[in-house]
Amino acid sequence: MLIGATSWQINGSYLKNIEQIGKDIQFCELLVYTWNTNTEKILSKEMDEIQKRSKITIHLPTDKLENVKNAYEFFKDKDYLNITLHPFMNFKQFADFYFSISEKEKERKISIENPENDIFFEFCDYLKHKSKNIYITMDYGHLLLDKRSITRFYKRFSNQITEIHFHGTNGKKSHCYPDQKTIKGFKKLMREKDFSSDFPVCIELFNLDETKRLVADLKNK
């Protein structure tokens, strides 16, 4: 697996975060939680250097579908491992947009994540048989927080999973440093399911020291 980290490790731009994460971290997830002129200006200035320094995945905005569309237009021709979207409540509008880009870009990975609620599963129910035609970013920490079975999720969607987001939970919130039981369970999944060497796993923590510690822990088999 390729182990990555988010672009929210230190106060600073996307490029400054990439400069800090170090060589042991093999890609950076660019967290783009909204889209406005300031975000576009920063990324336009930094994108060439970002691509020289690191492989990337991209997390598109979560606030408005219009911002998702605008951000996608910016990133669609960039070199990326995977693009992640959250589902939106207007399922028809979201599905129309998702399939309009995913069917056009069949050789590139554009995936839908399971957030900290039921919306992903409700969206799959809405899609019915077409749910087999989506790529999926499996968020391990969100499944733990929602007390959903990792095993059942993987069994249902295994052929569609293109990226995993890994973090822990304290029972009230996710994106916490995982306890040893969680780490052992995650290592077991990765070992038993025989993921490829270039499969992206993003550690979704927002603290540089914790991120580097978890990278070391995951590499210590």
Language model regions located:
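Histidine-acidic metal/acid-base catalytic patches
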Residues: 1-3, 11-20, 65-74, 79, ...
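Hydrophobic faces of well-ordered beta-strands that scaffold small-molecule active sites
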Residues: 1-7, 26-30, 54-60, 81-85, ...
